[in-house]
């Protein structure tokens, strides 16, 4: 095993990695949600007028669904949760405003992390999230969030530490690089993000706990020794480490149970109007009589435009206000709706 000492790593990639780790360690406290504010939310009983842990956790799951729907990366989701929690820990928020705040957190994070071509429009996010607010509402709330967080939105999160720890391990191990799955670790981090309690953990500690538990399952002495050196360099004391590792272990045990709705596997639910539901229902059982497409034939652009218009008409209800009592709504599993709308 290679030594993690800076002397041995002089002139190598390891020096830069440890330097970056020092920067992250200096920054992490500044971007953590106020513990006092999080504790107030934790102590709040569930009712209709006050923000409680259950509402916060449900909103984070909504953010995960939005990130999955728009194909956003894990960094966008984790940063959105960080922005959301930092704001909730500062302000006394009413439950009716939580949807708007959640959407704004997602949009702010996406603009920081994603490429321009992958940033969803405000209109699309409003429609898909069904947050019942306008583009003007989103703009005003984004301004409020940015001001309250002093425009420091690009935070150092547990995901930054997770990626850096993972890179440091691979830089110093002789074992196969694919043995430690970063995708699996990211999925586990997202599971922790869905619980308010882990927003109180230091990002460096949370990331190290996830890696430690995964390395233990691999039963790799070499990887464990590297982690111990990283822990020592990060100045993480045993009491803090073992406390959070126990909580993470319990969370992941529940996450892997059959009863748990896993963040990456939870099915999206789509609410559609009666007219759209009727169209989907009919198309499922009917066999469309389409003309045979000749080989080498030209694609008719006018037909494509007509079909797009038909689809947009059917989806008008997604961006409108909630249906009245006389209007029936149907719940469709997203995978089913996707199959019906986009046949292979």
From Swiss-Prot:
May play a role in growth regulation and in negative regulation of cell cycle progression. It comes from the Eukaryota. InterPro entries: Cyclin (IPR039361), Cyclin-like_dom (IPR013763), Cyclin-like_sf (IPR036915), Cyclin_N (IPR006671). Its main location: cytoplasm. The keyword Cell division applies. Keywords: Cell cycle, Cell division, Cyclin, Cytoplasm, Mitosis. One of its GO terms (biological process) is G1/S transition of mitotic cell cycle. Residues 301-320 are annotated as: Disordered. GO terms for cellular component: cyclin-dependent protein kinase holoenzyme complex; cytoplasm; nucleus. It is found in: Cytoplasm. The keyword Cell cycle applies. Residues 301-313 have a biased composition (Acidic residues). Pfam families: Cyclin_N. GO terms for molecular function: cyclin-dependent protein serine/threonine kinase regulator activity. SUPFAM superfamilies: Cyclin-like. The gene is CCNG2. This is Cyclin-G2.
């Amino acid at each position: 095993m290679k030594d993690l000492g800076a002397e041995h790593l002089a002139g190598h990639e390891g020096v830069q990695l440890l330097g970056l780790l020092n920067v992250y360690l200096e920054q992490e406290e500044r971007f953590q949600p106020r513990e006092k504010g999080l504790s107030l939310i934790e102590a709040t009983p569930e009712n209709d007028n006050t923000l409680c842990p259950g509402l916060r956790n449900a909103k984070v799951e909504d953010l995960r669904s939005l990130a999955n729907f728009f194909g956003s990366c894990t960094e966008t989701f984790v940063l959105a949760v960080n922005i959301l929690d930092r704001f909730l820990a500062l302000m006394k928020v009413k439950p009716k405003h939580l949807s708007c705040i959640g959407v704004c957190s997602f949009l702010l994070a996406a603009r920081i992390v994603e490429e321009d071509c992958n940033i969803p429009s405000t209109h699309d996010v409003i429609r898909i999230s069904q947050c019942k607010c306008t583009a003007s509402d989103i703009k005003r709330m984004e301004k409020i969030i940015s001001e309250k967080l002093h425009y420091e939105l690009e935070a150092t999160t547990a995901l930054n530490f997770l990626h850096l720890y993972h890179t440091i391990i691979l830089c110093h191990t002789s074992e196969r690089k694919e043995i430690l799955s970063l995708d699996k670790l990211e999925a586990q981090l997202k599971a922790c993000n869905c619980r308010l309690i882990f927003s109180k953990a230091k990002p460096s500690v949370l990331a190290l706990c996830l890696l430690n538990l995964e390395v233990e399952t691999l039963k790799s002495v070499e990887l464990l020794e590297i982690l111990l050196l990283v822990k020592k360099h990060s100045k993480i004391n045993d009491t803090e480490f073992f406390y959070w590792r126990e909580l993470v272990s319990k969370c992941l045990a529940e996450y892997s149970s059959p009863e748990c709705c896993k963040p990456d596997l939870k099915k999206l639910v789509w609410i559609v109007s009666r007219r759209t539901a009727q169209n989907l229902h009919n198309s499922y059982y009917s066999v469309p009589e389409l003309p045979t497409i000749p080989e080498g034939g030209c694609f008719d652009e006018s037909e494509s435009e007509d079909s797009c218009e038909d689809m947009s008409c059917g989806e008008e209800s997604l961006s409108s206000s909630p249906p009245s009592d006389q209007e029936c709504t149907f719940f469709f599993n997203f995978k089913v709706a996707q199959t019906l709308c986009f046949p292979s």
